[in-house]
A protein has these predicted regions:
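Non-catalytic peripheral regions of nucleotide-handling enzymes
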Residues: 3, 13, 27-33, 59, ...
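A short, structured beta-strand/loop element
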Residues: 21-46, 62
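Short, compact, well-ordered microdomains
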Residues: 47-83
Length: 83
């Protein structure tokens, strides 16, 4: 399953959100569908994710990503990281 949170962190005059998934393969495939390059993946982060701006968040949801709270995105990412 693919998820996108409600973080809405402001950076460069845009709101940014976290795209996470139950598996890295699924996450990378979905990110590619959105046009995100793999280099945009936060590989060194404590929680594996891609940052997406609001327009891509809306597109992700229309393509099947489940909107979730940020705390749930952190939990999902930690579980993935700890595998």
């Amino acid at each position: 399953m693919i998820y996108v949170d409600d973080a809405g962190l402001m950076k460069h005059d845009r709101a940014w959100f976290h795209l996470v998934a139950d598996s890295l393969d699924e996450l990378h495939r979905f990110a590619a569908t959105l046009g995100l390059p793999e280099r945009a993946f936060h590989r060194g982060a404590r929680h594996p994710h891609y940052d997406v701006p609001d327009d891509l968040r809306q597109r992700a949801i229309s393509l099947g990503a489940m909107p979730i709270y940020t705390r749930d995105a952190v939990r999902i990412s930690r579980k993935l990281r700890d595998r």
